């Protein structure tokens, strides 16, 4: 290892490597694929610092390499373009809130604690669930935590998920449960794009710890007859988990109404911009059953009174958490997405119940308009005839790679490629009629 001006203590590094029985630093990264390892020396810290104007110029040069789009991307699959009220950014920028760290000291954090309490209350109302924590990192993490809750409650070692799950969420889940040696079983998808409910009868429920359903599913299809799933789970001592798009609840049944034990999701749709994958916020909620609540990881803010009878907010049930009792903690999560959760609370407060319903209706109308235009122009057909929300899977008559490349050349980002002729399109309230028409017309010219 060569000396570096920022890392001068080479002898100490060698001592540490010797202590853990490693010859060099590279051995610590053997699990990283070889083609991802940088083979040249990274020239950082050798030259004298640049003036501010030079730094700004260099960063602008890098930014110029970004693709300039005429319209918001028609790309969803877990991250969605939505209109964000400007007041959200203003509130988040206030110094009292501008931190993502947990407010451990209630005597100096009443503002942020109340903001998180309002987030929990608003989210509980939206989901029609009883208890909501003050956020996780993202949807995948919340799902994994919910599955581990189920395992701790009943001790069974199989987890049932649908084939129509977001593949990134599945990767996170499989990584988390591998340490507990839990087995993941998939429910097949039928010809209508929905889960095959008959498959449940073939399962040995004595082995099933939890069952997870995504609504709408990864392909945008709205699942139906979910009461059958919750009834089956309740009769067989299986923890039922529903992953849900928050904005879809303006039109479809909530997890609470359907009788699910746990609800998970992502707050990205609620006032958070697209930003190279994050930060977003993971939603985790349960019904009021202390068997569930005691196993719920993450921070929970409660309202109480101080010794003088004044209303106050503080973290509650902290013995569930690893900083309180590490060896018996429900999770190793040590913080949350407080700032993002606050943005979610502001967004929900601004829209209210009617606003959420109107927005969901507008998204529904625009996405169905886009599909109709694509079918009217005989570009292909939708893969499933079932109803959908916000996203739909389209099967083209010709090669989608060529279509997508041409769209990018024209400053339009199409849907997510699922196969040689298949793509998943997302349409929300930010996609105007003109944007949709231009998308369809461009595809018609090159299809």
Swiss-Prot record:
Q: Does the keyword 4Fe-4S apply?
A: no
InterPro entries xref list: GcvPA (IPR023010), GDC-P_N (IPR049315), GDC_P (IPR020581), PyrdxlP-dep_Trfase (IPR015424), PyrdxlP-dep_Trfase_major (IPR015421), PyrdxlP-dep_Trfase_small (IPR015422)
- According to the UniProt entry, what is the EC number of this protein? 1.4.4.2
Organism, per UniProt?
Metallosphaera sedula (strain ATCC 51363 / DSM 5348 / JCM 9185 / NBRC 15509 / TH2)
Function in brief: The glycine cleavage system catalyzes the degradation of glycine. The P protein binds the alpha-amino group of glycine through its pyridoxal phosphate cofactor; CO(2) is released and the remaining methylamine moiety is then transferred to the lipoamide cofactor of the H protein.
UniProt GO BP: glycine decarboxylation via glycine cleavage system; nucleoside metabolic process
Q: What's the subunit arrangement here?
A: The glycine cleavage system is composed of four proteins: P, T, L and H. In this organism, the P 'protein' is a heterodimer of two subunits.
Q: What protein does this entry describe?
A: Probable glycine dehydrogenase (decarboxylating) subunit 1
Single GO MF descriptor: glycine dehydrogenase (decarboxylating) activity
Q: Which residues form a coiled coil?
A: none
Question: Gene3D superfamilies under this entry?
Answer: Aspartate Aminotransferase, domain 1 (3.90.1150.10), Type I PLP-dependent aspartate aminotransferase-like (Major domain) (3.40.640.10)
Q: Locate the transmembrane regions by residue number.
A: none
**This protein's UniProt keywords:** Oxidoreductase
Regarding protein family, the annotation reads: Belongs to the GcvP family. N-terminal subunit subfamily.
What catalytic activity is recorded? N(6)-[(R)-lipoyl]-L-lysyl-[glycine-cleavage complex H protein] + glycine + H(+) = N(6)-[(R)-S(8)-aminomethyldihydrolipoyl]-L-lysyl-[glycine-cleavage complex H protein] + CO2
Q: Which domain of life is it from?
A: Archaea
